[in-house]
A protein has these predicted regions:
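N-terminal leader/targeting and pre-domain segments
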Residues: 1-52
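Non-catalytic, surface beta->alpha helical segment in thiol-disulfide oxidoreductase systems
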Residues: 2-17, 112, 117-156
Length: 156
């Protein structure tokens, strides 16, 4: 369970959390406007419905992070439209130095957040790191369908 940690004149979450907590105050101040203004393309939603079957998702994010503020609400709205069960997603809120007291990030090479990691049968299919290369929907389709995809920090 995430804990609320003082951070200047605000609080941040650290540890495992869920989207319900991120939609509540004070985080709703940044979550709601982006969520309400984003409309996923219906054709992408239909494609993602089948591609998301049996896929597990882990999200590393920061309630203090502007990139998380920009991407997370869109991610939630997209998954809701694709009828993916949000409650099964592992959401991990990190400190400003991108760590957790429980070391959830160990061995996962989390360098930038948000990081969305997609797994099938325990094998990583790919990840979207910090921001989408094309757009969130297109990047997810590429990762989940096995098309060539390099996230923004994959320079190999």
């Amino acid at each position: 369970t995430a804990v609320r940690v003082p951070d200047g004149n605000t609080v941040i979450l650290v540890g495992t959390t869920d989207f319900a907590e991120l939609r509540a105050a004070p985080f709703s101040d940044w979550f709601d406007p982006v969520y309400l203004s984003f409309t996923p393309a219906p054709e992408n939603v239909e494609t993602l419905k089948s591609l998301l079957e049996d896929v597990e998702i882990v999200v590393f994010m920061g309630t203090w992070c502007e990139d998380s503020h920009r991407e997370l609400p869109k991610f939630v709205k997209l998954l809701e439209a694709a009828e993916y069960p949000l409650e099964v997603i592992e959401v991990i809120a990190m400190t400003r130095d991108k760590t957790t007291p429980q070391d959830y990030e160990a061995g996962l090479d989390i360098t930038n957040i948000p990081t969305f990691i997609f797994y099938k049968d325990g094998v990583e299919l790919g990840r979207i790191v910090e921001f989408a290369v094309e757009d969130l929907e297109s990047d997810m389709i590429k990762v989940l369908s096995g098309q060539p995809y390099k996230h923004a920090y994959d320079w190999d």
